[in-house]
Structure formats: structure tokens, C-alpha cells
């Protein structure tokens, strides 16, 4: 166990859930430290007031609950979506992108309150411990970080439940009357892990899903929407200008009702193991489809292809916790440059889990119907030019083929 005897005051990232409530009590009883709680409102909704009440019940005097929804979407989610970031081709990074903002505020609140350290509830098996701590050290190289899951003697959630009962800490239960799934939620997504989901062959029970109706139960009629973009960011919905957080919240509602954004995946954690989770990202799934659609008519081919080549590396940096690294910032500058003319409108239909693009338009479109028409293009494109183009590109292939023929 690491020694933290010199720690007198700790800022704890506190959700009000089982893990962080036990950590709070552990910091008080084992370290004798004064605890300051910080709860970020990233759009998780009803979690917040119970977190305040539980912190008060546990004797906390300094309770910080901050509405960071606009900052979260504007400064973290939207920059990531300019890159069309997907980790391992499927994961929209809903948990990953929230950690840098939470850790940033932990470091700032520690400085504001004169705390000796910060603490988080991430386990020693997961990615979040890395994300929190890499961010903290990037912003304050001298910060002290307490990670109780790596220090205490608890080995399982059963141990946690026993500790909670011994210290009169309320334990919520899910609809099956058991200890809850491990869950995370913010304005971009919700996730569920653990219990039956630890078997990758087991179908997720329907009650696991927090954000969406089943696609099979979604309306039999499509919902049509239009999203407006400016410099790569969504700025309007159905012609109405709205703030980043408001827009994402509205897309979440639309996606929820139409069963959009569910994924069941097994991912490769940064720490080396595979994990299975059920993620729901209704608004983000719609936004990604719309952003790619507007890029399709406003981005040059070379720029678009380069972005797609760089995207996996960019997504991996976010997944692994390197939001504040120089390489992520370098890639962000390139991505942001590519978005200068990414503006216009995209029309979509939402239907039973599907996001269907039905139109896109932009004053800065590179699409030319005069060039692609099957009718008379009035000299806009001379098809005879294609012969020389093909001949030059075939030169190396013909040379290789000739050598193979000579070699028999």
C-alpha cells in the first residue's frame, strides 16, 4: 500500500456511486484526511443531487458541483468529432473524452482549496486511472494522486458492499434487486459493464440500456431532421441555432426515441486486457453521420483521405488518456485547419436504429453536377483525357506484368 501520511486535504472526483462513496469514507478513516468532493455535471442528470446529499451525509463540508456541459461539448466533444474519431472502428469515446475535463478541474480545485492531493475512483484494471493521472501530471507535474483501488485491501465488489454496510453507506440496486452494473453517463453517452456482461456470449438484458428504446420497439415512421454546420461544428437543428450542449441533448432525445446509438463491443484496454461493455451514444451517432456527410461535399479528396488515415491514431490518443499531449494538439491543429470550409446542412432520417443521410448542401461545396452528369456536360469534362490518365497509372503495373511474363 502506498503511504499518504503527509496528506491532510484531498479533492475527490465524486459521483455519489458505490465506489467513490466508499473511497470518501476510506480517505477519512484510513488517512484521516479532510475530503473536498467535486462532481462534474456533464449531463448525467439525476445523479447530481443524490451525490450532494450523500456527500453531506458523509460529513463533507466543501462540496463542488459544477455545470460543465457547455465546456464539455464545446471544448472536448466537438473538437473530437471534427476528426470523426472512433476507437477500434466502433467506440465513440464517450467515457474517454470526459476524463480530461474532470481531471483538469480536480487539479484546479486542489490549487484553489489548498489541497495536498487529488483522488479518483478508477480501478487498477481500467483505462480511467491512466486518463485521470496523465491529465493531472500534464497540468501539474508535482500533483499528488491517490488511487485507492491500487492501495487498499479490497479485492472485489463484495468487499466493497461489506465495507459500505459496516459504515452505513447506502448501496443502490438495479431492477433485478442486485448490486448495480458498473455504469458511466454524460451528455455524450452512457456505458454499462460488469455482471452478466462479463461473459461476451451473454446477450445484454434489455434493462441494461439507459438511454435508448430498443430499435425493435421504435416508431414505425421515420423522423426527419436537418443539422447545420459551421467550421466543422454542428450549430443548428432544424434551422434553429442552439448551443453545443443543447444541440447534443436534443439529438440524444431524437436518437433515444428512434433506438439509435446502441453498441455491444469488446475493446482492447490500454492496460492490456480486453473488456466488454454496452454503450449508448444516440446523439453522437447522429452527429458523426451528419459530419461525415457534410465533409463529403466540402473536403478535398486528399485532405479527406489524410484525415481518415490519421483518425485511428487520434482516437487512440484520446482513448489512452493523452488529450493534453503535444501529439494530440498537433493533430488537432491539422484537423481544425481542414474544417475551415466544412459548413452547410445535412438532412437525415432516423428510423429503428438507423441514421439515413438523405441530402447535403453547402455554399462551399466541391461537388459539381456539371462534371458528374450522365447528360451533356457541355464540355466541362473531356472523357478522352481519361485514357492518358489510365495509361500513366498503369505504367508500373504493365512493367511488373512484363517482368513476370519473362520469368515464366
From Swiss-Prot:
Its main location: cytoplasm. It catalyses: L-citrulline + L-aspartate + ATP = 2-(N(omega)-L-arginino)succinate + AMP + diphosphate + H(+). This is Argininosuccinate synthase. The lineage of its organism: Bacteria, Pseudomonadati, Pseudomonadota, Alphaproteobacteria, Hyphomicrobiales. L-aspartate binds at residues 123, 127-128. It is an enzyme of class 6 (ligase). Its EC number is 6.3.4.5. CDD domains: ASS. HAMAP family: Arg_succ_synth_type1 (MF_00005). Transmembrane segments: none annotated. Belongs to the argininosuccinate synthase family. Type 1 subfamily. ATP binds at residues 13-21, 40, 121. InterPro entries: Arginosuc_syn_C (IPR048268), Arginosuc_syn_N (IPR048267), Arginosuc_synth (IPR001518), Arginosuc_synth_CS (IPR018223), Arginosuc_synth_type_1_subfam (IPR023434), AS_cat/multimer_dom_body (IPR024074), Rossmann-like_a/b/a_fold (IPR014729). GO terms for cellular component: cytoplasm. Homotetramer. The gene is argG. Keywords: Amino-acid biosynthesis, Arginine biosynthesis, ATP-binding, Cytoplasm, Ligase, Nucleotide-binding. GO terms for molecular function: argininosuccinate synthase activity; ATP binding.
Amino acid at each position: 500500500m502506498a503511504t499518504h501520511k503527509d496528506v491532510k486535504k484531498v479533492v475527490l472526483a465524486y459521483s455519489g456511486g458505490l465506489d467513490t462513496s466508499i473511497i470518501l469514507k476510506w480517505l477519512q478513516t484510513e488517512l484521516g484526511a479532510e475530503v473536498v468532493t467535486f462532481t462534474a455535471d456533464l449531463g448525467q442528470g439525476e445523479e447530481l443531487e443524490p451525490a450532494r446529499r450523500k456527500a453531506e451525509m458523509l460529513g463533507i463540508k466543501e462540496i463542488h458541483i459544477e455545470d460543465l456541459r457547455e465546456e464539455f461539448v464545446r471544448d472536448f466533444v466537438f473538437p473530437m468529432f471534427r476528426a470523426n474519431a472512433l476507437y477500434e472502428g466502433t467506440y465513440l469515446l464517450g467515457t474517454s473524452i470526459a476524463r480530461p475535463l474532470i481531471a483538469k478541474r480536480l487539479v484546479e480545485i486542489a490549487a484553489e482549496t489548498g489541497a495536498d492531493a487529488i483522488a479518483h475512483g478508477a480501478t487498477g484494471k481500467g483505462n480511467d486511472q491512466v486518463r485521470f493521472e496523465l491529465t493531472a501530471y500534464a497540468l501539474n507535474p508535482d500533483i499528488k494522486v491517490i488511487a485507492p483501488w491500487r492501495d487498499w485491501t479490497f479485492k472485489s465488489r463484495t468487499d466493497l458492499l461489506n465495507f459500505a454496510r459496516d459504515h452505513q453507506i447506502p448501496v443502490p440496486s438495479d431492477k433485478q434487486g442486485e448490486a448495480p452494473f458498473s455504469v458511466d453517463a454524460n451528455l455524450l453517452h452512457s456505458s454499462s459493464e460488469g455482471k452478466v456482461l462479463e461473459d461476451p456470449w451473454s446477450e445484454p438484458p434489455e434493462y441494461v440500456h439507459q438511454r435508448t428504446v430498443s430499435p425493435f420497439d421504435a416508431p414505425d415512421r421515420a423522423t426527419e431532421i436537418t443539422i447545420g454546420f459551421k467550421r466543422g461544428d454542428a450549430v443548428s437543428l432544424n434551422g434553429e441555432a442552439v448551443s453545443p450542449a443543447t444541440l447534443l441533448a436534443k439529438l440524444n432525445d431524437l436518437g433515444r426515441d428512434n433506438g439509435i446509438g446502441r453498441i455491444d463491443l469488446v475493446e482492447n484496454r490500454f492496460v492490456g486486457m480486453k473488456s466488454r461493455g454496452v454503450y449508448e451514444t444516440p446523439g453522437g451517432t447522429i452527429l458523426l453521420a451528419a459530419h461525415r456527410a457534410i465533409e463529403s461535399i466540402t473536403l478535398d479528396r486528399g485532405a479527406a483521405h489524410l484525415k481518415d488515415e490519421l483518425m485511428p491514431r487520434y482516437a487512440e490518443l484520446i482513448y489512452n488518456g493523452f488529450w493534453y499531449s503535444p501529439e494530440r494538439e498537433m493533430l488537432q491543429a491539422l484537423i481544425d485547419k481542414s474544417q475551415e470550409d466544412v459548413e452547410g446542412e445535412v438532412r437525415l432520417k432516423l428510423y429503428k436504429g438507423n441514421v439515413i443521410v438523405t441530402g447535403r448542401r453547402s455554399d462551399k461545396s466541391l461537388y459539381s453536377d456539371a462534371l458528374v452528369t450522365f447528360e451533356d456536360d457541355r464540355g466541362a469534362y473531356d472523357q478522352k483525357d481519361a485514357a492518358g490518365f489510365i495509361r500513366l497509372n498503369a505504367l508500373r503495373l504493365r512493367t511488373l506484368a512484363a517482368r513476370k511474363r519473362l520469368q515464366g
